[in-house]
Amino acid sequence: MAPAKNQENINQKLALVVKSGKYSLGYKSTVKSLRQGKAKLIIIAANTPVLRKSELEYYAMLSKTKVYYFQGGNNELGTAVGKLFRVGVVTILDAGDSDILTALA
């Protein structure tokens, strides 16, 4: 029961980031923000292809950015950020009022 509760908690924190913080969606913008050093946290969906996931992990390691692996697929991640389309990667640039950076550390 704890994983479902934890997932709901993360979804709420993501919704708060969308309302009050800065974020970007997608692989290309994530790599760009990682290379510029602007990303604070990246959230990767569970069904992201392995090669793409490893590239994101590599860039995150270079920029010393935290990586969180979302337990749902890209459909669920898109719904969590309030979009009606699939989202493979979410980059948190500024958490706003959310404590997602400390909660997922």
Curated annotation (Swiss-Prot):
For this protein, the parts annotated as crossing the membrane are none
Q: Give one Pfam family.
A: Ribosomal_L7Ae
What superkingdom does the record give? Eukaryota
What Gene3D superfamilies does the record point to? Answer: 3.30.1330.30
The family database entries (SUPFAM superfamilies) matched by this protein are listed as: L30e-like (SSF55315)
A GO MF label: RNA binding
Q: List the GO terms this entry assigns under cellular component, sorted alphabetically.
A: ribonucleoprotein complex; ribosome
Q: Which UniProt keywords apply?
A: Ribonucleoprotein, Ribosomal protein
Q: Does the keyword Oxidoreductase apply?
A: no
Entry-linked NCBIfam families: PRK01018.1 (NF002172)
**Family, similarity comment:** Belongs to the eukaryotic ribosomal protein eL30 family.
Name of the protein described by the UniProt record:
Large ribosomal subunit protein eL30
Task: Report which gene this protein is encoded by.
Answer: RPL30
